[in-house]
């Protein structure tokens, strides 16, 4: 082999050696770029935005895993949409059977929010705080000033609004499909009730009122009125057509003279025992001439159904219908 050929062989050997040494690094770099690209693509697909009822847009790169709920209705909706380990804290009312339908399920999440102090919420290290709009504006502002990711929603006043809230919270938690499943179940139950009531003529439909011993309350838009509409009865208080929400006098209650009186069973202060409330109404001299009192149609009804605005509003429709038309549904 001459000198020229020998040099050529050495050169080729060096090139081959360099390829062997640097090819893994080259491939590794290429794979790293591919992995990074795939990761970025996955993040783009998993990220989403939602806008709350104040117009504030929230950005998420992944589903929230430390959610804090500030109302019983949100508690109930969340428990139907996400696993318990994704909820950091629920509202204190979730443990009250007078207004909560998930007392047992809620035991899986021990933490509770108390009062309106946002500083206390920080201890839960939340990545999402859901607050209904009936809380004080200064509380909502404080939450945002503390850097918390806060979603504020409008409290629903009818079944349509409840479905909207479920869709909002489902989108917020990255669980849209589960949200639609919850709504579908609600709608199916309400439809079944209405089908059973279809043959009751308008002239035989019952007029009802929700009453406590202190009296009744009028609100032009209220969830109980919508429950009544779907349950084949009418909320007699809505006949008053007052310009705004207000208390109803005993005289007006007597004038309305409903077929049925429903007493919400919620002893919220230890002074409103459901049976005691019912007896007070039955024994009130002002009410003795009312047909509901005379016929003994003063019924206690679960506050957990008629006082909250979650998917359990479908249960409220069913319960009101059953209690109003036992001849259709059979006596409990």
Roles of regions detected by a PLM:
Residues 53-55, 107-119, 156, 241-250:
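Short helix-initiation/N-cap motifs at beta->coil->alpha
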């Amino acid at each position: 082999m001459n000198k020229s050929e020998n040099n050529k062989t050495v050169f080729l050997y060096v090139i081959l050696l360099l390829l062997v040494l640097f090819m893994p690094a080259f491939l590794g770099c290429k794979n790293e770029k591919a992995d990074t690209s795939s990761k970025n693509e996955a993040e783009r697909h998993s990220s989403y935005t939602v806008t709350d009822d104040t117009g504030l847009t929230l950005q998420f790169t992944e589903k929230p895993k430390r959610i804090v709920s500030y109302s019983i209705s949100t508690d109930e909706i969340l428990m139907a949409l996400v696993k318990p380990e994704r909820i950091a804290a629920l509202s204190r009312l979730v443990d009250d059977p007078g207004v909560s339908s998930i007392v047992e399920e809620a035991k899986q999440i021990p933490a509770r929010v108390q009062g309106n102090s946002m500083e206390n919420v920080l201890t839960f290290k939340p990545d999402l705080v859901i607050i209904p709009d009936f809380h004080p504006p200064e509380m909502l502002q404080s939450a945002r000033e503390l850097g918390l990711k806060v979603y504020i929603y409008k409290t629903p006043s009818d079944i349509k609004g409840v479905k909207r809230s479920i869709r909002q919270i489902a989108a917020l938690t990255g669980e849209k499909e589960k949200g639609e499943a919850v709504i579908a179940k609600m709608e199916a139950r309400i439809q079944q009730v209405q089908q059973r009531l279809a043959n009751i003529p308008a002239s035989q439909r019952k007029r009802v009122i929700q009453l406590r011993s202190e009296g009744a309350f009028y609100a032009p838009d209220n969830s109980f009125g919508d429950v009544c509409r779907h349950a084949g009865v009418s909320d007699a208080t809505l006949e008053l057509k007052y310009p705004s929400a207000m208390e109803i006098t005993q005289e007006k209650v007597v004038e309305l003279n409903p077929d049925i009186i429903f007493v919400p069973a919620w002893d919220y202060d230890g002074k409103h025992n459901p049976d005691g409330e019912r007896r007070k109404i039955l024994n009130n001299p002002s009410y003795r001439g009312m047909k509901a009192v005379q016929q003994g149609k003063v019924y206690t009804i679960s506050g957990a159904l008629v006082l909250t605005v979650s998917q359990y509003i479908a249960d409220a429709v069913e319960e009101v219908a059953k209690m109003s038309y036992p001849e259709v549904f059979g006596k409990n």
